[in-house]
Amino acid sequence: MCNTPTYCDLGKAAKDVFNKGYGFGMVKIDLKTKSCSGVEFSTSGHAYTDTGKASGNLETKYKVCNYGLTFTQKWNTDNTLGTEISWENKLAEGLKLTLDTIFVPNTGKKSGKLKASYKRDCFSVGSNVDIDFSGPTIYGWAVLAFEGWLAGYQMSFDTAKSKLSQNNFALGYKAADFQLHTHVNDGTEFGGSIYQKVNEKIETSINLAWTAGSNNTRFGIAAKYMLDCRTSLSAKVNNASLIGLGYTQTLRPGVKLTLSALIDGKNFSAGGHKVGLGFELEA
């Protein structure tokens, strides 16, 4: 099995405690279904309560398992069309090759990326290249794993300017119920997170970040509590006194309701708080 995470997935458990179960300032509906022929359909709609703006997207996915191929098509209300073709675990176990294209009919703009990733038990590597003959940007990352320790590097190189535009490092440790993650971005942004699964019902997370040459330190704590197998409560707070609360209820198999609220602790009586409603249906 290929268990080494990608660079973007380092510290994912802590991020999930902070991000999942919330949807401040919007009404969101997600629908997922699968046809008899194996085509997967998913659609999502958002309506933002402060601006009244609404947006949505539609995605279809079809897998040809015998050949390791996956075809994905995407459309959103900004009239952007996307097509993705991936080929996985056929040329070599853990190797995935992807062609990702985007087309905007209104402007005629076209863009694309070639992606490759290779994952094994002790390492994972990957690279993306923009399809741009004027000077593509090359993205790359690598993660090494040894007895629970993880070390990662991420970079991007602008060939048009012959300049390294991104230079990130990460170091962490992962156990069954505990994760530690630290990172440095471009030598100026520093951050870290701690994830702890206290027991089967309680998950906690701490997040800390700061920027060199600035006094702006960001700090937050979050927790998730499972009331039962169908109901969970989430809460988080940061050093800006923003308090987030979330309630998730599985009404029946495949039907989930999420209620959330963001409270400004510094200006509690002034208003400006945000609420959110989410509805997920899978059939």
UniProtKB/Swiss-Prot annotation:
Its main location: mitochondrion. CDD domains: Porin3_VDAC. The modification N6-acetyllysine is found at K12, K15, K20, K90, K266. Belongs to the eukaryotic mitochondrial porin family. Keywords: Acetylation, Ion transport, Isopeptide bond, Membrane, Mitochondrion, Mitochondrion outer membrane, NAD, Nucleotide-binding, Phosphoprotein, Porin, Transmembrane, Transmembrane beta strand, Transport, Ubl conjugation. Pfam families: Porin_3. Consists mainly of a membrane-spanning beta-barrel formed by 19 beta-strands. This is Non-selective voltage-gated ion channel VDAC3. Expressed in erythrocytes (at protein level). Widely expressed. Highest in testis. The modification Phosphoserine is found at S241. The modification N-acetylcysteine is found at C2. The modification Phosphothreonine is found at T4. GO terms for molecular function: nucleotide binding; porin activity; voltage-gated monoatomic anion channel activity; voltage-gated monoatomic ion channel activity. GO terms for cellular component: extracellular exosome; membrane; mitochondrial outer membrane; mitochondrion; nucleus; pore complex; synapse. The gene is VDAC3. NAD(+) binds at L242, I243, G244, S260, A261, L262, I263, D264. It is found in: Mitochondrion outer membrane; Membrane. It comes from Homo sapiens (Human). The chain crosses the membrane at residues 26-35, 39-47, 54-64, 69-76, 80-89, 95-104, 111-120, 123-130, 137-145, 150-158, 163-175, 178-185, 189-198, 202-211, 218-227, 231-238, 242-251, 254-263, 273-282. One of its GO terms (biological process) is behavioral fear response.
